[in-house]
Amino acid sequence: AYQDVNFNDDGTKMYTISWYDDYIRQYTLSTGFDVSTASSSYSSLSIASQDGLTNGMTFTNNGTRLFVAGDSSNSIIEYTLSTAYDITTASHVGSTSVASQATAPESVAFNNAGTKMYVVEKSNHNVIEYDIATPFRLNSETGTVGTILRGTYGTLTLNSNGSYTYVADSSIVGLDANESVIDYFNYTVSDGTATDTAELK
């Protein structure tokens, strides 16, 4: 049985999630938001290794992160997508337990800024609100120098000399005049002897 349905920003991709087999399925729509034009074939992403009873799902505004409500694990499961809204490029980042507040989470949503997360708790029919320190980030990511780290609006590469390169996603080209967005990266680096922690934005 399908538990949730979602679309990309222009409605040309549709996603369903099923607790029966723990798969997210991605369909292409030739006409945006018209389900009668959905392709018969689909791409899929298995959530089974992270949770055995998945419910709701949501994407970040630019489609580079995916969050799934895991009923059996009482957690929110987080993925990064190297290509926006393409679940075949998804990588599991981690799972965040909400068991102490939300038993059997049924759905998950964020405010536009990604600084608040809302989880529908099935057992007692509550909506639980969480503050998020770094927008749309529930789990930290690790990597070596030169590794590309995905942000909300682009990617960051840290170099061995302490410099960095940031590449903005093409999606932000659509910003209106005088409109801006901010990406946040909290990082800790170590050379085996000393460590340093900082925030880039």
Question: What is each model feature region?
Answer:
Residues L45-Q50, T96-Q101:
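Surface loop/turn motifs at the tips and blade-to-blade linkers of beta-strand repeat domains
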Residues W19, D71, K122:
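Short loop/turn segments immediately following the C-termini of beta-strands
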Residues Q26-T37, Y79-T88, E129-L138:
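Short loop/turn segments immediately following beta-strands, especially the blade-tip
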Residues F7-D10, N61-N62, F110-A113:
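Residue-level detector of Asp-centered blade-edge/turn motifs that repeat once per structural unit
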Residues E141-K201:
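Acidic, turn/loop-rich segments in luminal/extracellular domains of secretory-pathway
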